[in-house]
Design a protein with these regions (language model features):
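Short alpha-helical segments that sit at the start of domains
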Residues: 1-15
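Short helix-capping/hinge SLiMs at alpha-helix to coil transitions
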Residues: 19-23
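Short, hydrophobic-biased segments on the C-terminal half of alpha helices
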Residues: 46-47
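Conserved segment of winged-helix/HTH DNA-binding domains
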Residues: 65-87
Length: 87
């Protein structure tokens, strides 16, 4: 169902992880291992999702950690869609 609204496979996987686990914090390489995608593609999509406000990030040493912005205007709706599509 989400593939109709989110056409990028990598972006869809990222949204599913962060909507399903809103307290999840990780860096690009950790997420790449989790969803089995190329870190370069993940980095690009994380930046896009941060730009629209779905994700936030903070710099920790040489890496950047990404986490869900629970104040994102449609976060609850998106989370509900993800949970329903997983059932």
């Amino acid at each position: 169902m989400l593939d109709v609204f989110i056409t990028s496979r990598v972006r869809r996987k990222i949204v599913v992880v962060y909507a399903k686990y809103p307290d999840f914090h990780t860096h690009v390489r950790g997420l790449a291992k989790l969803i089995k995608e190329d870190p370069g593609n993940i980095q690009r999509e994380l930046k896009r999702l941060e730009k629209v406000g779905f994700l936030q990030s903070e710099k920790q040493g040489n890496s950047r950690t990404y986490f869900t912005n629970k104040q994102f205007p449609i976060f609850k709706e998106l989370q509900s869609m993800v949970i329903k599509s997983q059932q």
